[in-house]
Amino acid sequence: MSNFEIRVNESYESFKNIDCFENACVVIDNMLRVLENPKNMNIYWKKIVPMIPKAYYDRDPKSDTKEELLYLVCSNSFYLDELFEKAEDEQAINALSKCEQECC
């Protein structure tokens, strides 16, 4: 085995002990908080909010077996970043950055 091959027991070791479900929940918490301001709400977010999986509201990562919450956050990270930047919300920007770096 060469030095560059990844052994099965070593793959994804860097993701060990990272709670991506919780990271995604924090991003959605911030998104919903920012969207409480009517000036931040638009047709795009009106379509996205109903897509938030039940697992988020239950705060139950075991019910999110397909990782739908993380997928929702990661696939919309560009738009979330734009939303948070426009709102000048550092807390939300930092939460998204952490989730992107650790999980997306």
Swiss-Prot record:
Q: Which GO terms describe its biological process?
A: nitrogen fixation
Q: Would I find Membrane among this entry's keywords?
A: no
- Disulphide linkage map: none
Q: Which Pfam families match?
A: CowN (PF20543)
The answer to whether UniProt assigns keyword RNA-binding to this entry is no
InterPro entries for this protein: CowN
List keywords of the entry alphabetically.
Nitrogen fixation
Function (record text): Is required to sustain N(2)-dependent growth in the presence of low levels of carbon monoxide (CO). Probably acts by protecting the N(2) fixation ability of the nitrogenase complex, which is inactivated in the presence of CO.
Q: Which family does it belong to?
A: Belongs to the CowN family.
Protein name in the entry? N(2)-fixation sustaining protein CowN
Gene designation: cowN
